[in-house]
């Protein structure tokens, strides 16, 4: 199985991810690396060019990495941030079309890749300012809502996504994730 931690910024995804460093392939910092190497705009400043690069990079990673891994972000996150920034993207109509195209692309991808498990990490504590991620709580809540709405939409169309909500302390979250991974036979 392939595992994706998904949720708004500052919910503890990277903290959870690093508990698996020595047990499986870890995919992290994709967006930060693109921002550093290509200068793309992210968070509230995200634009069509940057979101397109992020989508393409994640599709490349997901399509070409078939071995077991865990990632601290996924396409659900990219769709959510894109929805948040739609009003800032060129013309509203063009932004809406772009999002619809990306959701359809995600649906097609999901139908062909049923070996992905999503761990949804909701907002349970304040975001820490690390100098990169947005600390705007309203933006954060919007990102979180968009992810939940996307999962609800996917469920409504019968997508069959494997989604688990993971809450609690870091230890409780890890226990939940590890139990699910054990059920899939991926860790002992």
Task: Please identify what each model-predicted range represents.
Residues 5:
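Hydrophobic anchor at the beta1->P-loop junction of P-loop NTPases
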Residues 1-2:
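Pre-Walker A (Motif I) flank of P-loop NTPase domains
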Residues 9:
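The conserved Walker
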Residues 49-113:
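Glycine-rich phosphate-binding loop used to anchor ATP phosphates in small-molecule kinases
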Residues 85-152, 159-168:
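A glycine- and Lys/Arg-enriched "phosphate-lid" helix/loop adjacent to the NTP-binding pocket
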Residues 18-60:
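Conserved substrate/cofactor phosphate-moiety recognition/catalytic segment
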Residues 13:
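Conserved lysine of the Walker
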């Amino acid at each position: 199985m392939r595992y994706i931690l998904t949720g708004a910024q500052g919910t503890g995804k990277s903290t959870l991810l690093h508990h698996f460093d020595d047990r499986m392939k870890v995919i992290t910092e994709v967006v930060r690396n693109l921002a550093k190497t290509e200068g793309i705009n992210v968070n509230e400043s995200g634009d069509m060019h940057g979101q397109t690069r992020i989508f393409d990079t994640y599709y490349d990673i997901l399509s070409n990495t078939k071995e077991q891994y865990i990632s601290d972000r996924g396409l659900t996150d990219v769709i959510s941030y894109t929805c948040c920034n739609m009003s800032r993207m060129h013309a509203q109509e063009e932004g809406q079309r772009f999002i619809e195209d990306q959701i359809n692309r995600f649906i097609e991808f999901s139908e062909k890749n049923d070996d992905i498990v999503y761990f949804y990490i909701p907002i349970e504590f304040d975001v820490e300012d690390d100098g990169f991620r947005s600390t705007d709580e309203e933006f954060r809540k919007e990102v979180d809502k968009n992810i939940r709405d996307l999962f609800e939409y996917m469920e409504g169309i019968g997508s069959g996504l494997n989604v688990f909500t993971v809450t609690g302390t870091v230890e409780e979250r890890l226990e939940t994730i590890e139990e699910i991974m054990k059920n899939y036979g991926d860790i002992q």
